[in-house]
Amino acid sequence: MTELAIGIAAGLAAIGGAIGVAIIVKAVIEGTARQPEQRGTLQTLMFIGAPLAEAVPIIAIVIAFLLFFMG
């Protein structure tokens, strides 16, 4: 039963990270379409924001694996 819970936690963390990055990329594409001259600035912010959006799911997956292997 614990394995199922850990699998669900890891899966939901991965889905959450993917949705977060997709929202960031969508906003950058919309911003670039509105103001093409700001493309560089928006890309830089995206390259900073995407890893931040992925950090929490990565930590959640690490915690799930720790619970699996240690518990």
Curated annotation (Swiss-Prot):
HAMAP family: ATP_synth_c_bact. It comes from Shouchella clausii (strain KSM-K16) (Alkalihalobacillus clausii). It comes from the Bacteria. The chain crosses the membrane at residues 5-25, 47-67. The keyword S-adenosyl-L-methionine does not apply. SUPFAM superfamilies: F1F0 ATP synthase subunit C. Its main location: membrane. It is found in: Cell membrane. This is ATP synthase subunit c. GO terms for cellular component: plasma membrane; proton-transporting ATP synthase complex; proton-transporting two-sector ATPase complex, proton-transporting domain. One of its GO terms (molecular function) is proton-transporting ATP synthase activity, rotational mechanism. Keywords: ATP synthesis, Cell membrane, CF(0), Hydrogen ion transport, Ion transport, Lipid-binding, Membrane, Transmembrane, Transmembrane helix, Transport. F(1)F(0) ATP synthase produces ATP from ADP in the presence of a proton or sodium gradient. F-type ATPases consist of two structural domains, F(1) containing the extramembraneous catalytic core and F(0) containing the membrane proton channel, linked together by a central stalk and a peripheral stalk. During catalysis, ATP synthesis in the catalytic domain of F(1) is coupled via a rotary mechanism of the central stalk subunits to proton translocation. Key component of the F(0) channel; it plays a direct role in translocation across the membrane. A homomeric c-ring of between 10-14 subunits forms the central stalk rotor element with the F(1) delta and epsilon subunits. It is a multi-pass membrane protein. Belongs to the ATPase C chain family.
